[in-house]
Amino acid sequence: MVRMNRSGVVLVGLALLAGCGAEERVEVTPDGVVGEGMAMETAEAVGGEYTAQAYCDDVTTWDANWASFETQVLNLVNQRRAAGATCGGVAKPAVPAVALDTRLRCAARKHSKDMAVNNFFSHTGTGNTAPWDRMKLAGYTYNAAAENIAANQATPEAVMTSWMNSTGHCNNIMNGTYKKLGVGYYYRASGATYKHYWTQDFGAP
């Protein structure tokens, strides 16, 4: 169940990498919604019945326009990192650029597709998978990792504005620990509440 609190923040009632009964916060923005920015500082092992290649098979061939959007988001992230930013009133210094990692892109694409096809919005995917599970299933081993999600924003510029205006997401984008990034964008014209679904998966090998 999704419910709106008095501050205008949507609260999704489910457990997310926390004790039972925790709530995942979803912020409403003028262009859409953004899920609570998540970060993991130590690697966790995960098992899986598929090889990384098989796991990524359905997102290897991608719509050219979607892939272009993903590249634009990566470029916008690096522009922000180069310029420095203010996240929740706290100044963040310029940090080095992140580079594309195709395994993280696989994990991000899988999650954006999952949210659109199954019409939900959460860091927890089908099969109760966490972001860290998807990264490991895609073959990526990390020492630190983070995920940002968003929905309904129709352009790379709009989704970046939403993320940068949200403290947790902005912190993930401006975190110099992360060296790699994968972006996933998926569009579903009908049958999905928000149509446009976005995921950023950050990693530090």
Question: For the regions a protein language model found, what residue spans apply to each?
Answer:
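Bacterial N-terminal signal peptides that target proteins for export
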Residues: 1-10
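C-terminal motif of bacterial Sec signal peptides marking the signal peptidase cleavage site
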Residues: 16-19
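Bacterial signal peptide processing site
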Residues: 21-24
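Disulfide-stabilized extracellular recognition modules
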Residues: 26-29, 34-39, 44-55, 142, ...
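A short alpha-helix/helix-coil micro-patch that ends at or immediately precedes a cysteine
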Residues: 51-117
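Solvent-exposed, polar/charged alpha-helical surfaces in well-ordered, non-transmembrane soluble domains
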Residues: 71-82, 102, 106-113, 133, ...
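Bacterial peptidoglycan biogenesis and beta-lactam-recognition machinery
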Residues: 87, 121, 169-171
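Short, surface-exposed glycine/acidic/tryptophan-bearing loops
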Residues: 101-154, 173-175
